[in-house]
Amino acid sequence: MKKLLYISVNTKPEEMSSSKTVARKLINSILEKHPSMALEEVDLYREHIPQLKYSYFESRSAIVNSEALAKLPQDEQNEVTQIIKLCDQFRAADIYIIASPMWSLSFPAPLKEYIDCVVQSGKTIAFDENKPYGLLNDKERTFIYVQSSGANIPWIIRPALNKGLNYVHDIIRFLGISKFEELLVDGTGTTELERQEAIEKAASRIETLVDQI
């Protein structure tokens, strides 16, 4: 059974969040076309996302083994167990959807902390002559980044301003996922009318994206 992993990073209720509203429309369309697909959801403001410590690792990006884990204090054992859980869940997915607002030219901090948890040696990356490479090219995977922003960002300056999108694209491609799509909810503005127009414009691309899955 294929798995769809939905990761949201916004404290707003779904009906108030433009990125989460569009992401839900996308998810519903995917599940309508693929009813047997399993959906898992991670809200990065509700799920505990550990901050990494040196004591959690035995080597570069490699989580401690079970013997070393047992020697850690119980609270640190719990943190390592959560990191492993998040990484294993990420690695098992076939389709990924992230819903995030654009904050300060990037994204909210919990998303970076989450990415740090799922980049693990032997699971999502490996090293060859001290050079890292991704392991998630082992099967067909699709990644869709849904991002909302208050302004309409001209495409010609988007690479310079949209640093969050650039980073997510680069790290996902580095992990080995070659199929990366963006679904931008630009121009949510300052009024509800502007927000709804931006949502409708972004949602008009959903059918095309779903057909590519």
UniProtKB/Swiss-Prot annotation:
Cofactor: binding details: Binds 1 FMN per subunit.
Entry's Gene Ontology molecular function annotations: electron transfer activity; FMN binding; oxidoreductase activity, acting on NAD(P)H as acceptor; oxidoreductase activity, acting on NAD(P)H, quinone or similar compound as acceptor
Signal sequence extent: none
The keyword NAD appears for this protein: yes
Catalytic activity as recorded in UniProt: 2 a quinone + NADH + H(+) = 2 a 1,4-benzosemiquinone + NAD(+); N,N-dimethyl-1,4-phenylenediamine + anthranilate + 2 NAD(+) = 2-(4-dimethylaminophenyl)diazenylbenzoate + 2 NADH + 2 H(+)
EC number of this enzyme: 1.6.5.-, 1.7.1.17
Matching Gene3D superfamilies: 3.40.50.360
Subunit structure: Homodimer.
UniProt organism field: Ruminiclostridium cellulolyticum (strain ATCC 35319 / DSM 5812 / JCM 6584 / H10) (Clostridium cellulolyticum)
Gene: azoR
A Pfam family hit: Flavodoxin_2
Family designation: Belongs to the azoreductase type 1 family.
Residues holding FMN: 17-19
Cofactor(s) named in the record: FMN
Purpose of the protein: Quinone reductase that provides resistance to thiol-specific stress caused by electrophilic quinones. Also exhibits azoreductase activity. Catalyzes the reductive cleavage of the azo bond in aromatic azo compounds to the corresponding amines.
Enzyme class: oxidoreductase
Protein name listed in UniProt: FMN-dependent NADH:quinone oxidoreductase
